[in-house]
UniProtKB/Swiss-Prot annotation:
It comes from Corynebacterium efficiens (strain DSM 44549 / YS-314 / AJ 12310 / JCM 11189 / NBRC 100395). This is 1-deoxy-D-xylulose-5-phosphate synthase. The keyword Transferase applies. The gene is dxs. Homodimer. Catalyzes the acyloin condensation reaction between C atoms 2 and 3 of pyruvate and glyceraldehyde 3-phosphate to yield 1-deoxy-D-xylulose-5-phosphate (DXP). It catalyses: D-glyceraldehyde 3-phosphate + pyruvate + H(+) = 1-deoxy-D-xylulose 5-phosphate + CO2. Its cofactor is Mg(2+); thiamine diphosphate. Binds 1 Mg(2+) ion per subunit. Binds 1 thiamine pyrophosphate per subunit.
Length: 636
């Protein structure tokens, strides 16, 4: 790592001789493989942008000239070149480097949201601010790719950027044909055609040389052919796509030819006005295991053997796999079921459905808003759509869920993977808002399975709903041990345990613990501990948590304290809804909530995040005993 060890700032990079850059690129790739193998992270995207990121920091004056990485999972090389290489052993760990850009880490990081398609809007606003300040020689660079240009927000931003003819916005399209998997849609097809241009031009040049070597006849033939050259070319290569937006376009540029990248970026730097630089890169470049992973090119990995790319720990049965398998079964029984993903068929478990029912599967690109309203259209025409997305990305499509689906009482099922605390991907990837968001949607039903069996049951029940939207939410990771109900009430609420105080006492308070989804495991353990502290405990799982089942209100009226345990934010979730329902029924039973605090959570492992916010079993027990002591004077 000889050259890499000498780089701690972009100024060091600019001082390098051109002949050193190829060696540096190789060192960076080796560094990435070694470090990401030890911590997990986004490997494939970063292997693909090594030369591009070197070029960006050689050509532009960061941080004075902001370089904004859309989504920013491909910002590892940027972090290395701005002095954070020594901290890569802490990537995605508590107190360590974020897996995305982070304003707290470096002045070179201007933004930190990891949701796609936002960089161009940031750039538009920043360039307007620079213009207002009279700072006309300051570029703003937005690097967008990995499928993000399939998001509508990018095109809204481009429309505004193009209108600012005297604003220096450099849009770098990192075109690797991928998001998690091959990018889908008309825009992706246009980029694929643009990638044909170097080949086309080589053929035309060869033809030109051949014809001109034939003398007068060849010259006349070339002139005749040249007359319709552009017409033919436009039918093959849609080079007008970006210029028709009113923006200068250069490319495609080989993203792994350092000199070509540097020259293109230097041209863009000196161009006065908005400009697009189209750079073609290869995701996973230089690492054989990634290049062999044709489905995802090692977009994201866990801890692995750097020599082979094989995970260190064997994967266990997970929530996503169980959902995937059950949806295929349902799809086999019902031809009206269709599935929609927003560029994440593999991560959300829809790849198997797509393989079994390709005509009933739709990948809409990184376009959650469109996904929900397209699903509404499918429902209007008699289908039952299942939209599978990460919980955090429902935030982007809330208006569509509310106004395009729920207002019309349409039977659309939204499956939310990665609900609750996800951990290492940080603040913007936690799925802690979905319960609060969906709680205000009229007519919606929200299910939270506690284990594999209830996931399968609730998914089947959800697709049977035909008079409004339904949501099934589950967390990231391995499935917990199955939990059998000892009784099921008429409205579907499962009684998981009746636990009597030990020793038995007529004075023992009666506690009702309401567990939301996978928090049932913790709720049962809490119940056992509170029994030992002198309480009678009933543990229930509502299964369908929104709206609040009436049997919960009745149960609450018969208890001395109600404790809800959920993995969403404390305001607006199941605990809040239950409290409202008790107030409406004039039930005065005290109620308390164990939930995620109303704040953005720093990245760390899921277990560490829960521990840091008193959501682990020991902390919850301590909290509950405090409540008991204050209410009943009997907690130990």
């Amino acid at each position: 790592m000889g050259i890499l060890n000498s780089i701690s700032t972009p100024a060091d990079l600019k001082a390098l001789a051109e002949e050193d850059l190829e060696v540096l690129a190789g060192e960076i790739r080796s560094f990435l493989v070694d470090k990401v193998a030890a911590t997990g992270g986004h490997l494939g995207p970063n292997l693909g942008v090594v030369e591009l990121t070197i070029g960006l920091h050689r050509v532009f004056d960061s941080p004075r000239e902001p370089i904004i990485f859309d989504t920013s999972h491909q910002s590892y090389v940027h972090k290395i070149l701005t002095g954070r290489g020594d901290a890569f052993d802490t990537l995605r760990q508590k107190g360590g480097l974020s897996g995305y850009t982070s304003r707290a880490e470096s002045e070179h990081d201007w933004t930190e949201s990891s949701h796609a398609s936002a960089a161009l809007s940031y750039a538009d606003g920043m360039s307007k601010a620079f213009q207002l300040d009279g700072d006309t020689n300051r570029n703003v660079v937005a690097v967008v790719g990995d499928g993000a240009l399939t998001g509508g927000m990018c095109w809204e931003a481009l429309n505004n950027i193009a209108a600012g003819k005297d604003r220096n916005v450099v849009v770098v399209v990192n075109d690797n044909g991928r998001s998690y998997s091959p990018t889908i849609g008309g825009f992706a097809e246009n980029l694929a055609q643009l990638r044909m241009e170097p080949f086309y031009d080589r053929v035309m040049e060869q033809g030109k040389s051949t014809l001109k070597s034939m003398g007068w006849v060849g010259e006349r033939t070339f002139e005749a052919l040249h007359a319709f050259k552009e017409g033919v070319k436009s039918t093959v290569i849609p080079t007008e796509m970006f210029p028709e937006l009113g923006m200068k376009y250069i490319g495609p540029v080989n993203g792994h030819d350092q000199k070509a990248v540097d020259n293109a970026l230097a041209y863009a730097r000196d161009f006065k006005g908005p400009i697009i630089v189209h750079v073609v890169t290869e995701k996973g470049r230089g690492y054989a295991p990634a290049e062999r992973d044709l489905d995802e090119l090692m977009h994201a990995t866990g801890v692995m053997d750097p020599r082979t790319g094989i995970p260190v720990a064997a994967s266990k049965p997970g929530w996503t796999a169980a959902f995937s398998e059950e949806l295929v079964k349902l799809g086999g029984r019902r031809e009206d079921i269709v599935a929609i993903t927003a560029a994440m068929a593999g991560p959300t478990g829809l790849a198997k459905f797509a393989a079994n029912f390709p005509s009933r599967f739709y990948d809409v690109g990184i376009a959650e808003q469109h996904a929900l309203t397209s699903a509404a259209g499918l429902a209007l025409a008699g289908k039952h759509p299942v939209v599978a997305i990460y919980s955090t990305f429902l935030n982007r499509a809330f208006d569509q869920l509310l106004m395009d689906v729920a207002l019309l009482n349409l039977p659309v099922t939204v499956v939310l993977d990665r609900s609750g605390v996800t951990g290492s991907d940080g603040a913007s990837h936690n799925g802690v808002w979905d319960l609060a968001l969906t709680s205000i949607v009229p007519g919606i039903r929200v299910a939270a399975p506690r284990d594999e069996d209830t996931l399968r049951e609730l998914l089947g029940e959800a697709v049977d709903i035909n008079d409004g939207p339904s949501v099934v939410r589950f967390p990231k990771g391995d499935l917990p041990a199955p939990i059998e109900a000892i009784e099921t009430l008429e409205d579907g609420v499962d009684i998981l345990a009746y636990l009597e105080a030990s020793p038995a006492s007529e004075d023992a308070p009666d506690l009702l613990i309401v567990a939301v989804g996978e928090r049932a495991t913790l709720a049962l353990e809490l119940g056992e501990r509170l029994v030992a502290a002198g309480a009678n405990v009933t543990v229930v799982d509502p299964r369908w948590v929104i709206p609040i089942p009436q049997s919960l209100v009745a149960l609450a009226a018969d208890h001395d304290l109600v404790i809800t345990i959920e993995d969403g934010v404390i305001h607006g979730g199941v605990g809040s809804l239950l409290s409202d329902a008790l107030n409406a029924a004039e039930v005065d039973t005290p109620r308390r909530q164990v939930a995620v605090p109303q704040k953005f959570l720093d990245h760390a492992s899921r277990g560490q995040v829960l521990l840091d916010h008193d959501l682990d079993i020991d902390s919850v027990e301590k909290t509950a005993l405090g409540w008991m002591d204050r209410l009943f004077g009997g907690g130990n």
